[in-house]
């Protein structure tokens, strides 16, 4: 039994300290103040004095409460009463002294303290279901308290839990407070009607003292005992409820964990971040980072993801997804209703393609000179990129693109700008690699081909060879039963040019090309450039509708109002119909070749849509770059410094040329050397380009442009060299050479001589000396050697000595005898071969 102070005992029994000190003194226990402690022996003496002073009868009752199939609680209840006088109802009793209630409450409190002091009490896990069952059972047991008309029951039952049995050491939570109060009153009423002998009371006292030592409380739950004591103390000496003292409430967990995972529908937009995706799925960002890591992608919670990656994550985590329609504004603005308009026939749009030096440019020049009015022949703007040719049977629109690279980018953007491809093949050269590539591009775009066999005026021309080579590549001429027209032409003499144009018009009739001539205009950007005094200039091919001066247009991420329009002859015009190439001024910037051009009635919406497109491009670019960097992080780990980088600053005259060169240079990158275009633009090379080149150690390349005076002065000071080109193929070749110079040289072994061992001499001073005959090349003293036996290498090392007769020799040539001493090797035998080699550096090539 734990020690307790007089003040604590007075507080537990609700008595004044002075009154308690007097009562202790009457029992022979001398205490002077409330801070004095009561030993277990004194407490035992106090209990015996109180019990011996009572003229009472006792009764003990043991009940068992089952919670479920495995658990139960045994409760032992001892009740005491004293009959003051007889009444009509035998159940009614009165207390002998009010102090009995205090004594009983004191005993219960002491017993609770005993339980709390046990070191081996095991903490029992609370079981919510067991608590519910216990509450239901106690509610069934509890009945209304007996009331009589004449007297009140003033005696309080003294309750002691003798033993709590909990199988598997699983504890049970404390029962509800109200149910325990009712149960206590019910037990008391049962004790009133019980007649117990004095002898049995004495036996119960002994059992009580024995179990108070701690044996009966090994598996008791202190929380339950303290709550029972608190419930008893909440009644006063007359059985009424006290208002101030309240038993502590048992905290219950109100959240119920869902049995099944909630499936959510996640709306995914382009460039969604990891944190946004986690918030929409109601998970932590670290879980999504973990899923990405398992997919081989390293990411942070603030990183943007592309839609495909976000879809994989949502599906991996068991949710559904919907794609956000970010093109709602674009569809509402750009889609034009043309149901009330009629279609008319339009001129075909033709692109001339072919291998370099096959006469493509010469053929274009001849068509320009012969099919344009003589007075206007020299007035054609060379950079317009598109022009119209009028014939007796109709008009033809030619596209003068920078090459097949730009044509490929147009097809990739989905701009249906070309109707027919004229494939130029030199009769004296035949099919070349770029010819094959042009065929593949045309077939991929499903565009019909008209073959122009050029240079037939040369003596070595062989048109039949060209037909045979193209037939092997599935380009079958009509004369062989195919559907491809072949026309023999000469760009120098003009032979066959009229037949070529007639074949193009015939092919266009078969295609039945039509377009809308009314309504808002639609088209495609052929070329764009920046001109001094005019600003951004774009060459646009109108495909549908009627483009007028003053219209609000949107070209990719650029917008503006058409301030002026010029046709292919450089004349100002007010309107342009389908299949008409025009130059327009007034855009906010330079659009990319292949961007769609649309007319929008509301300038505010055009500006808003341009900003939206620009933002989407930036987000997509950032997401793609981060995906590429992070996906290659593990592969590049530990390989830093192995891959060389050639940094280039590219400036060109027109947007199409810059894009074509950029794509061609990026394709040159290999595992050892990478081409990195850190900046590109249109216009002259400026001082800012030179400053950037110095800071990043980059090469400055100009295509059909030159550096201004300020840039030249700065370049001389900083030692920056400019490289100017006007032919794309020369530029690519020089870049290849520069990349080859960055490659690490390759080490190769070259055998320079072989000596055959004819005889072996043993020397105590020099070891084994091989007498050899040089049968091939030359044997040098300083070069490494290999010893071969039966053409198998058995040793590799260096020469220790090389002698000719008795003199040292630096080298011995073929057909001469010599003595060779191999360093650190004495097992040279007759018939072996000594192979002499040298290691040389060989420059790598791409």
UniProtKB/Swiss-Prot annotation:
<dbReference type="InterPro" id="IPR036925">
    <property type="entry name" value="TIF_IF2_dom3_sf"/>
</dbReference>
<feature type="domain" description="tr-type G">
    <location>
        <begin position="345"/>
        <end position="512"/>
    </location>
</feature>
<dbReference type="GO" id="GO:0005525">
    <property type="term" value="F:GTP binding"/>
</dbReference>
<feature type="region of interest" description="G4">
    <location>
        <begin position="454"/>
        <end position="457"/>
    </location>
</feature>
<dbReference type="Pfam" id="PF04760">
    <property type="entry name" value="IF2_N"/>
</dbReference>
<dbReference type="InterPro" id="IPR009000">
    <property type="entry name" value="Transl_B-barrel_sf"/>
</dbReference>
<dbReference type="InterPro" id="IPR005225">
    <property type="entry name" value="Small_GTP-bd"/>
</dbReference>
<dbReference type="InterPro" id="IPR053905">
    <property type="entry name" value="EF-G-like_DII"/>
</dbReference>
<feature type="region of interest" description="G2">
    <location>
        <begin position="379"/>
        <end position="383"/>
    </location>
</feature>
<feature type="region of interest" description="G3">
    <location>
        <begin position="400"/>
        <end position="403"/>
    </location>
</feature>
<dbReference type="InterPro" id="IPR000795">
    <property type="entry name" value="T_Tr_GTP-bd_dom"/>
</dbReference>
<dbReference type="InterPro" id="IPR023115">
    <property type="entry name" value="TIF_IF2_dom3"/>
</dbReference>
<comment type="function">
    <text>One of the essential components for the initiation of protein synthesis. Protects formylmethionyl-tRNA from spontaneous hydrolysis and promotes its binding to the 30S ribosomal subunits. Also involved in the hydrolysis of GTP during the formation of the 70S ribosomal complex.</text>
</comment>
<keyword id="KW-0342">GTP-binding</keyword>
<dbReference type="InterPro" id="IPR006847">
    <property type="entry name" value="IF2_N"/>
</dbReference>
<feature type="region of interest" description="G1">
    <location>
        <begin position="354"/>
        <end position="361"/>
    </location>
</feature>
<keyword id="KW-0396">Initiation factor</keyword>
<feature type="binding site">
    <location>
        <begin position="454"/>
        <end position="457"/>
    </location>
    <ligand>
        <name>GTP</name>
    </ligand>
</feature>
<keyword id="KW-0547">Nucleotide-binding</keyword>
<feature type="binding site">
    <location>
        <begin position="354"/>
        <end position="361"/>
    </location>
    <ligand>
        <name>GTP</name>
    </ligand>
</feature>
<dbReference type="GO" id="GO:0003743">
    <property type="term" value="F:translation initiation factor activity"/>
</dbReference>
<dbReference type="InterPro" id="IPR015760">
    <property type="entry name" value="TIF_IF2"/>
</dbReference>
<keyword id="KW-0648">Protein biosynthesis</keyword>
<feature type="binding site">
    <location>
        <begin position="400"/>
        <end position="404"/>
    </location>
    <ligand>
        <name>GTP</name>
    </ligand>
</feature>
<dbReference type="GO" id="GO:0003924">
    <property type="term" value="F:GTPase activity"/>
</dbReference>
<dbReference type="Pfam" id="PF22042">
    <property type="entry name" value="EF-G_D2"/>
</dbReference>
<keyword id="KW-0963">Cytoplasm</keyword>
<feature type="region of interest" description="Disordered">
    <location>
        <begin position="198"/>
        <end position="219"/>
    </location>
</feature>
<dbReference type="InterPro" id="IPR009061">
    <property type="entry name" value="DNA-bd_dom_put_sf"/>
</dbReference>
<dbReference type="GO" id="GO:0005829">
    <property type="term" value="C:cytosol"/>
</dbReference>
<dbReference type="InterPro" id="IPR027417">
    <property type="entry name" value="P-loop_NTPase"/>
</dbReference>
<comment type="similarity">
    <text>Belongs to the TRAFAC class translation factor GTPase superfamily. Classic translation factor GTPase family. IF-2 subfamily.</text>
</comment>
<feature type="compositionally biased region" description="Basic residues">
    <location>
        <begin position="207"/>
        <end position="219"/>
    </location>
</feature>
<feature type="region of interest" description="G5">
    <location>
        <begin position="490"/>
        <end position="492"/>
    </location>
</feature>
<dbReference type="InterPro" id="IPR000178">
    <property type="entry name" value="TF_IF2_bacterial-like"/>
</dbReference>
<protein>
    <recommendedName>
        <fullName>Translation initiation factor IF-2</fullName>
    </recommendedName>
</protein>
<dbReference type="Pfam" id="PF11987">
    <property type="entry name" value="IF-2"/>
</dbReference>
<dbReference type="InterPro" id="IPR044145">
    <property type="entry name" value="IF2_II"/>
</dbReference>
<dbReference type="Pfam" id="PF00009">
    <property type="entry name" value="GTP_EFTU"/>
</dbReference>
